[in-house]
Amino acid sequence: MKRIYLVAGIILIFGATYAIEYYANSQFSTLELVVSEISGYEIGVVQTFNYFKDEEKVGTYTYTVDEYGDNFIMTSLTDVTYGGRDLELESVYTFDDAYLPESYALTVISDEGVTEISTTLSNRNITTSVTSEGVTVDIPGEYVDGTFLIENGMPGFWEVLFNSVELERGVKYTAIVYIPQGAMAFDVNLVVRKQDQLIWVGDERLACTVINEANLELGFYIYEGELVEMRSESQGTVLQKVLG
């Protein structure tokens, strides 16, 4: 049982802080974020991000989207070494054409051992189960219609979402997201900035559309439909896409 919480603590080193703050800005109109259908993805193409912690490259993150019957499946791998510790996260996420969850599974491999996290849905219930050292803890909750499932520290989840909606500058989009590693749902406010921002991605300087989320303390940088960088200022982490 102790290891479950220890591993969860390790995961949160690399994830965003769950500090919930009210975010409001009168200059932005507000719309609900709704996905009508999945679009803008490349079937079977591996997307790779370099993982930086405190400006030091500590690993990589990759994801792939494939068709899975009438649904879609996203496989992700995070491989990080930081502070003398190794951490590997392998996830499989199945979702429908509206980007709503069907099932989720995560395997966490760390120096302390292996932890399995799974999320299942039944009727209006959502349950995350955490298994370590042969002990399973179930964390039940109510599923609200339209809630997205997103691993906040994994850019693939966000990139598929952003590619599947038409985002307008100067608009704040609201949504509910369920984060399996926290086994909780959060209200998110995605603010699309009116002005582009120049950033370096590898050796290229790109003028990016900027999306900020205050509750999860995340910043996203979009260039020509691609999520090229995701930042968590509070955690000192940056995930930057390898452009090919």
Language-model features: locations:
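Acidic, serine/threonine-rich low-complexity disordered tracts
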Residues: 5, 13-123, 169-244
